[in-house]
Curated annotation (Swiss-Prot):
Keywords: Ribonucleoprotein, Ribosomal protein, RNA-binding, rRNA-binding. PANTHER family: 39S RIBOSOMAL PROTEIN L10, MITOCHONDRIAL (PTHR11560). It comes from Limosilactobacillus fermentum (strain NBRC 3956 / LMG 18251) (Lactobacillus fermentum). HAMAP family: Ribosomal_uL10 (MF_00362). GO terms for biological process: translation. Belongs to the universal ribosomal protein uL10 family. The gene is rplJ. Signal peptide: none annotated. One of its GO terms (cellular component) is large ribosomal subunit. This is Large ribosomal subunit protein uL10. Part of the ribosomal stalk of the 50S ribosomal subunit. The N-terminus interacts with L11 and the large rRNA to form the base of the stalk. The C-terminus forms an elongated spine to which L12 dimers bind in a sequential fashion forming a multimeric L10(L12)X complex. Forms part of the ribosomal stalk, playing a central role in the interaction of the ribosome with GTP-bound translation factors. One of its GO terms (molecular function) is large ribosomal subunit rRNA binding. NCBIfam families: PRK00099.1-1. InterPro entries: Ribosomal_uL10, Ribosomal_uL10-like_sf, Ribosomal_uL10_bac, Ribosomal_uL10_bac_type, Ribosomal_uL10_CS_bac.
Length: 167
């Protein structure tokens, strides 16, 4: 192999390593058996959520995780491998890929990283069923507003009762 090819592969390993270390989550999937239309649809769904999916050679991935906390992922680098990277919402890739895998038997989630930790397949599936960040924020806002509404109603009821007695 020429020095230029070796340098190119080393640069690719460095790039994948940087993506993995920067990502909030990276889910490893086997896409074997999906049609071109299905892969295009999956990529569109992921892109709409600001998630990048890349097909990466297993050897490149193995070298990219060497010496990191993600070495346990090496067991998932078998067969055709694609990785969905998210720098924002750590749960979004798991949710989208799980839903897609439920609808398309050919897609197999093999493992991944969520919130900078290697997760088991069971943990990834559990994360996928959790509400998203926006849903959780909305639930929190609602929970915080509810006591204030009750106090406002109580104060209004006392004020209305005072107005009735004064009349």
């Amino acid at each position: 192999m020429s020095e230029a090819a070796i340098a190119k592969k080393a640069e690719e390993v460095k790039s994948v390593n940087a993506q993995l270390l920067a990502a909030e989550s990276a889910i490893v999937v086997d896409y074997r058996g999906l049609t071109v239309e299905e892969v295009t649809d999956l990529r569109k769904q992921l892109r709409d959520a600001n998630i990048k999916m890349s097909v990466i050679k297993n050897k490149i991935l193995e070298r990219a995780v060497e010496g990191t906390d993600y070495e346990d992922l090496k067991a998932t680098f078998v067969g055709p491998t694609a990785v969905a990277f998210s720098d924002e919402d750590p749960i979004a890739p798991a949710k989208i890929l799980k839903k897609f895998a439920d609808d398309h038997d050919a897609l197999e989630i093999k493992g991944g990283i969520i919130e900078k930790k290697v997760q088991t397949l069971d943990a990834i599936n559990e994360y996928a069923t959790m509400p998203g960040r926006e849903d959780l924020l909305s639930m929190l806002a609602s929970a915080l507003q509810d006591p204030m509404r009750k106090i406002a109603r109580a104060v209004k009821a006392v004020a209305d009762k005072g107005d009735e007695e004064a009349a």
